[in-house]
Amino acid sequence: MSELKAPSLQSLLESERGSTDSLLAESLQLDFEDLDDAEFAIPPTDVLPTLEAVLSEFEADSDVASEFGMPVPHATPTPSIGEDSTIRTDGRGGGGSIMRYTLLHGISAQLSSAAERVNAGAASSCAVAAFIAIGTSHGHILNFDVTQTLRWAHQDKHGQGAVASLAFNADSTRLLAGFSRGLVAMLDTHTGDVLRELFDVITPNTGVLHVKWTSRSSLALCADAGGSVWSLSFTRKLGIRGCQSRCLFSGARGEVCAVEPLIMDSQGRHELDQYCIVALATLSKYFIVTVRPRLRVIKYHVLQGPPDCLPLLAWHLVLIQAADTSRSVDPVIVVGRGNQLFFHQLFVSNGRITLLYLRHVQLQGSLLSAHWLGPKCVASLDTAEILHLVDVRSSKELECMDMANAGLVYGSAQFKGLATGGNVSPAFALAGSNACYNSVVSRGTQLYVLGARSLHIIGVRTWSERISFLVKHHRWQEACQLALDGYIASVDRPRKRAQAKERIIMLFKEYIANSARAPEYCLGAIVNCLITVGELDLLWTQLWEKLHNSSTELFLQHISEHIEKETIHSVNPVISQALVDYWLEHSPAKLEQLILKLDWMCLDLNQVLKAVKKHRLFRAQIYLNTQALNDYTAALTELLPLVTPDETDLGNCLLVYVSSCLAGREYPSGEIPVELVHQVKHDVLRCLTSQHSKENAGDELPYPYLRALLKFDTRETLNVISLAFQEREFSNELGISHRKRIINLLLEIMSPENATWAEIGCLLNFIAQQISMQCLPRDRQLLERVLSHLAQEEIANESSRQHSERENAWHELLSSNCLAEISSDEEQLRLAEKAKCYCVVEYLLEKLERYDTILDSYIRNEARHETMFAYMERHVASPKRSIFRQLKRNLRELLTINAKETTRLLSLHYPEKINELLDNLRREENLLYLFLKCLNDRKSELEASQMELLLELYCKMESSSTVEEFLRSNSGYRLENAIAIAESHHLNRSVIYLYEKQESYAKAFELSMELLKSAAGEEAAKEAQTISALLARSVETLPAQELERCWFALLQYILPHQELQSITKSLLHEASQHIDLHNLVQLIMNTHNVSTSFGDIKDLLMGMLDSSRHKTEALRASAGALCQDLHLKFVKRYQHAHRGLWVTTTKCSMCRQRLYDHSQVLIFGGCGHGIHEQCMEESETQFEECPRCFTAIPDQSIGLPRPNKNLISISSSLEMGALQLKAPPRRFI
């Protein structure tokens, strides 16, 4: 068994180069030449698979993963990554189907072995390209190939600490490694040989944070813990490898935390390929720079965020569609910090590199990393170690996965500089406390998460893989919906659409194979998929056969839903028979709806026709007769005899059918074929106007079919005929003769013996409209017959609608001048007035220009009262309309109809006529009250006499409370007259209010006492409280003696009454503020029915004392607060008075001489300018603003008294030219 053991990691480290073969193959010592490639299915060695292709085979939900010992996740997957750890997924949008989790067991096992056997330490950083390189905390580097085979291992011999950062170049031939104590090493990825060891390419005594290759094969970037960024140019001259280091960004100007070069695989097809572009981010901003051909800053932005969060940068090429529908593939950078993600597009415009802001996404928690997983998604890991997958276009979170148990490696030690003595700034150390730049990396659509002894992959499944995942977990509903979404999204791409259709068919076959036990499960989604992709044959054959004995009813229900939605128009004949049988049993009405939307050719006509006749499905019967039998008259001859006033559905259905046929439209929808239109119209019209039916009973009246329709609904039948008359067939001479014939038939059918006057009226109105529209010739006899009907004075049971139709028909005949030959306008006017057709009257008056009586026609017509005021408003400015004369003549009627609108019209256009109109209404108090009330409501200025008249009318017609409310809300009356009016109507409360308004509180009190004496019970208590409030309001007006007398009078009445004891205490408390306490107690003691013991008045006296104490304390507190406020103000002003003034100039603003200390100086305030007091006196002008800068001067001018000591010596002032003040300067604002 010892021969089967793999060589140890120590042996690899001691060898000159790493292993180039598989460890397992080396241990077995197999002879590869003896193996047959075909027999063992060995792939060709010259074409190696990509890393993504190989790693995608090890997905957690595949059988291969299960063989490796990883359990397949179910609805809530928890795949094993170790002995005690799990990964939890939360499918918020994708239901756990979008992200695929994989644990690389081979690499994880090698990491554990290295840590235990050779003391390599925990993993510290990783890099992924064609190989997977992992650095450890003790300076070891392990390189794996795509099969997770360890190719070689490298151990640092110089004690440079942990491997802080790793980076592969573009062709994966070189590996850069940065160490925590400053060493940068370059290794050959195939052999593991060290090609370069660079000890002095960064800031001394600092560690490496990042090493990154740029788009140039010989140029790399390195960022150190001091915040500086260095460019490393690799050279090879005469076989000697060298490196030139250059500082691009110094940490003294800002500490760079993140570096991300732009690397595009466009092979020179993009305009940006000629530039070497790098994104840098500090703790306060991020910026885009070009390193080649010359160093230049393209753009920078401020970047804010929490102090313990690092900035994040990631590039990706994205297809961008502009607003003008143009498309371009440009690099897009995502910049993140805190919970914010910003997206910017980098492109070349007019030869200049431009950075364009695209969108902003805000997440829930603070971010640790952000990486592109394809051009549409960004994976972000937050501080709770939850991985969020965000759709860039919709800014929505698709799915999330809990990575807390993956054991994520943090690089906080490098940011804190622990390996170099901690010589980093506190802000840098705080920000790097959760750094994971080099332990979470991405490549393509896969994210690599490095644990201490494990490596995890989170990939984004493709559309097809997601469907397979959902199918495997029997989530058919989601799988079908996802498949349909992909099919619909590929509408503009035929190849993609064909692939999507093929995948849906495959999904259907998987459903058939897995639904043996419960075939009805998710049946609706499968049916929807097949109908959407047009695979109806599978629906009618395989699926129907699968469900034939178990779930046919559910299948038929789903098919019916799609027929109603008109997504399918034809079904298999076998299924159509089953469909008819099913719905005949459950809902014949539903069957009728389905028949109308199905192609008749898929139906069993014998079965369906029998069913529709048996169950009276008239619409379906008409549809089948016209479509299947091509007979457009059979429905009329069979169904019209069945029409009765109670058969509303059948009657309406036939009316719609006849209207459609005469208009050339199919029933219930569509168009009749062009070649059949004329024949169909002719056949239907001939059938309707046939003199006898097929049965031809002996007592049958002529024209039974048309008669049946007219009997069912005369008005709608005539509307159908009116629409038919508009068709082209009735516009020529033959069509006009057909019109005459139909009109004669209608007149013959609608005789007084066989029709009501309402029905005959509808017919005559119809004829009048046809004549007015020039659809019928002007036949004098016909016109006279029509006019005799229109001019009838009374028609029994005529509704308002019928009367309106009669008016409209008459009006149309007049406007088209059809009645000029048989009657004059004057005669028409008399007939219209007798028939009460006031619209016709108005038209004739307008025509005869007799405008002064038009308003009368509006007043008589109740239906036109609302439009009457619009008519007056429209013509109020026209003198010939005589609007005011008509208003004055009909004022009483107008006020009765709408007093508010009448008043508005008069006050707006005729304010000077108001008094005249009021005089005309003096004898009609009701109308006068309405008019005055509306004027007052419109806030019109009424005279005092008019207000008093309105008050008089209020007193007569409204309640006392309404009168009092009117008095309170208006003030245009005279108080003496108002009091007299109110007293004459015995409205005592209104009188009391007027006395109070007049400040005659004594009279108001006496009258209130009379009301109190006449009241009893609760009403008396309310009245007493009202009087108390009255006396409280009279304090400032009544003399003290009069006020005390009133209170004594009130209390003398209240105290003896036992029913008022409930308010006695409150009244005594209120009275104690206005009556001497000794007199009040004496009054209580002397009052009849009140005990003189101390116990009875104890509560009163204690209440008085408590009130007095509270008021005393309140007064003391108020006085203290006032004194304190005054003291604070005094202190503030005292402090201001002891502060010096800030003077900005040493020259007088008037005389421009120096401000010497021997003269008085005035300072203007906040501007700091000053003048001599003598200059101000000489100018004899009161300055309101500074003469120098025109700043407003405060009301209280500030003056500087002459000081006792010289503030400026003459010599120093002449030399320095400035004032020197001892007090600190201040500004006045």
UniProtKB/Swiss-Prot annotation:
One of its GO terms (biological process) is endosomal vesicle fusion. Its main location: other. Residues 67-89 are annotated as: Disordered. Signal peptide: none annotated. One of its GO terms (cellular component) is late endosome. It comes from the Eukaryota. Disruption phenotype: Semilethal: animals can complete metamorphosis, but most of them die as pharate adults unable to emerge from the pupal case; surviving flies are weak, fail to unfold their wings properly and die within 24 hr. The eye color is similar to wild type flies. In larvae, results in the development of hemocyte-derived melanotic tumors in body cavities, accumulation of crystal cells and lamellocytes and disorganization of the sessile hemocyte compartment which might be connected to the abnormal increase of circulating hemocytes. A zinc finger (RING-type) spans 1148-1189. Belongs to the VPS8 family. Component of the class C core vacuole/endosome tethering (CORVET) complex composed of at least Vps8, dor/Vps18, car/Vps33A and Vps16A; unlike in other species, Vps11 is not part of the Drosophila complex. Due to the reduced number of components the Drosophila CORVET complex is often referred to as the miniCORVET complex. Has a higher affinity than the homotypic fusion and vacuole protein sorting (HOPS) tethering complex-specific component lt/Vps41 for Vps16A, car/Vps33A and dor/Vps18, the core components shared by both tethering complexes. PANTHER family: VACUOLAR PROTEIN SORTING VPS41, VACUOLAR PROTEIN SORTING-ASSOCIATED PROTEIN 8 HOMOLOG. Part of the class C core vacuole/endosome tethering (CORVET) complex involved in endo-lysosomal vesicle trafficking and lysosome biogenesis by facilitating docking and fusion of endosomal vesicles. The CORVET complex acts upstream of the homotypic fusion and vacuole protein sorting (HOPS) tethering complex but is not involved in autophagic flux. The CORVET complex may cooperate with the early endosomal tether Rbsn-5 to mediate endosomal fusion. As part of the CORVET complex recruited to endosomes by activated GTP-bound Rab5. This is Vacuolar protein sorting-associated protein 8 homolog. It comes from Drosophila melanogaster (Fruit fly). The gene is Vps8.
